[in-house]
Amino acid sequence: MKKKVLAIALVTAFTGMGVAQAADVTAQAVATWSATAKKDTTSKLVVTPLGSLAFQYAEGIKGFNSQKGLFDVAIEGDATATAFKLTSRLITNTLTQLDTSGSTLSVGVDYNGAAVEKTADTVMIDTANGVLGGNLSALANGYNASGRTTAQDGFTFSIISGTTNGTTAVTDYSTLPEGIWSGDVSVQFDATWTS
């Protein structure tokens, strides 16, 4: 009996030692969505982003993911119009790190393989020259009809450059400081109804 008690005590002691040496490891991450609400059904041109952008650094590729950013375009028809043109132009695209480093990232915007630049308009629809807008073709067909016409399409967004401190460019994103960058990517849309 004493041997059984001693054996049970030894097994319990070894089991207790194993538990005492093990430590729980936990990790936590937070996902954040931007949230605003707006309704505009009376302006001649309304462009609504259908989501927000979140770029994540991937160690395996030493870079950031790219994202498709969808948008909805609504226009008011003009029965006197004989042609319609829709263009886009990049306004802002800098994300700044939320610490004291001053590190920045520049976001590139592409529409159907063409870069949307700050210095020139990107033609999305130009009915006079046969550019009918791909996924936005409903606008090319409805610009001179009464009422409103809507269509959806998307830009491809990607991180195209970065700095460690606001001035020193990086060629290897793995050298960027750790942290979170924040900012706005704004694209201006211009619509022209020609009568």
UniProtKB/Swiss-Prot annotation:
Part of the ecpRABCDE operon, which encodes the E.coli common pilus (ECP). ECP plays a dual role in early-stage biofilm development and host cell recognition. Major subunit of the fimbria. Induction: Positively regulated by EcpR. The keyword Signal applies. Residues 1-22 form the signal peptide. One of its GO terms (cellular component) is pilus. This is Common pilus major fimbrillin subunit EcpA. Keywords: Fimbrium, Signal. It comes from the Bacteria. It is found in: Fimbrium. Self-associates. Forms filaments. Interacts with EcpD. Belongs to the EcpA/MatB fimbrillin family.
